[in-house]
Swiss-Prot record:
Component of the GINS complex which is a heterotetramer of SLD5, PSF1, PSF2 and PSF3. It comes from the Eukaryota. GO terms for cellular component: CMG complex; GINS complex; nuclear replication fork. InterPro entries: GINS_A, GINS_bundle-like_dom_sf, GINS_Sld5, SLD5_C, Sld5_GINS_A. It comes from Eremothecium gossypii (strain ATCC 10895 / CBS 109.51 / FGSC 9923 / NRRL Y-1056) (Yeast). One of its GO terms (biological process) is DNA-templated DNA replication. It is found in: Nucleus. Gene3D superfamilies: 1.20.58.1030, 3.40.5.60. Transmembrane segments: none annotated. Belongs to the GINS4/SLD5 family. This is DNA replication complex GINS protein SLD5. Keywords: Chromosome partition, DNA replication, Nucleus. SUPFAM superfamilies: GINS helical bundle-like, PriA/YqbF domain. The GINS complex plays an essential role in the initiation of DNA replication. Has a role in chromosome segregation.
């Protein structure tokens, strides 16, 4: 078996957009971050951006359905491809240098698997914490969770919520007066629903807009620099966020820019 490292690396870099492509629910925000080219490198960069945003944002961000479908399909295909190549190498009496390319590819796959796992763990942690809030959101806006969660996350959320509510009822609530048995009471001095900390300060980087796509939200500040304007209700002021700049702002002030892919959290 003659292994050509150039052919192997070409397989890893080949654009496999068509693999595992599945329609995403309406409102999927994947294309807002990168809609120009669904290449392997672009998808990895977008995945890392989603990962960073999810780790910093106080709320659960929309699940990137289309992006994750492509990434997971490529990951499974490359793992299978690597196992096939490894089997062929082990059957040959070659020197150690022949195994080096396979070790490099395995390291790259482990790096990708780390990002995917970390992203999903972060999301599951928020689902656990904001279960009652998600329940309230689903009741207020039917269908909202279809965009916010993946199919697997939706199953996890429903089962986790059912188990938690059953535990609360059996251990505590059934022994209390009827007027105190609600787990989603918001009328008292302290709300029983744990919502995201909307006013938390976050660091953000203002992204440069695509050169071939005019942005109606983009303005020019007093120094002639392109910028986005945000309103700070507490101060009653409008602040210009220059493109390429790094700022610290309250999350609720820049949330819309984040959802539109104008800024990234750092």
């Amino acid at each position: 078996m003659d292994i050509n490292i150039d052919d192997i690396l070409a397989d890893l870099d080949r654009d496999t957009t068509a693999v595992g492509s599945t329609p995403a629910p309406a409102g999927d925000d994947t294309t807002r971050l990168d809609d120009s080219a669904a290449t392997v490198a672009a998808d990895y960069s977008t995945l890392v951006t989603h990962w960073c945003n999810e780790r910093v944002a106080p709320e659960l961000l929309p699940y990137p359905h289309t992006l994750m479908a492509r990434v997971l399909a490529r990951l499974a295909a490359q793992i299978e491809h690597l196992e096939t190549l490894s089997t062929g190498v082990l059957e040959q009496t070659l020197d150690r240098s022949a195994k080096l390319p396979l070790l490099c590819m395995e390291a790259e796959l482990e790096r990708l698997k780390f990002v995917v796992r970390s992203l999903l763990r972060c999301r599951l942690g928020k689902i656990d914490r904001f279960g009652l809030y998600l329940r309230q959101l689903d009741a207020r806006s039917p269908g909202a969770l279809q965009t916010l969660l993946s199919a697997q996350e939706r199953v996890y959320y429903e089962r986790h919520s059912a188990i938690l509510l059953k535990l609360f009822n059996n251990a505590i609530l059934r022994h209390m007066p009827a007027e105190m048995q609600a787990v989603d009471d918001t009328e008292g001095s302290v709300s029983m629903i744990d919502e995201p900390e909307w006013a938390r300060f976050v660091f953000l980087y203002v992204r440069e807009p695509a050169p071939d796509a005019p942005d109606p939200l983009l303005a020019v500040d007093d120094h002639g620099q392109p910028c986005y304007s945000v309103n700070i209700p507490e101060l009653g002021e409008v602040v210009d966020l220059a493109v390429g700049g790094i700022y610290i702002m309250r999350y609720n002030v820049i949330k819309d820019l984040l959802m539109d892919g104008k800024v990234v959290l750092i």
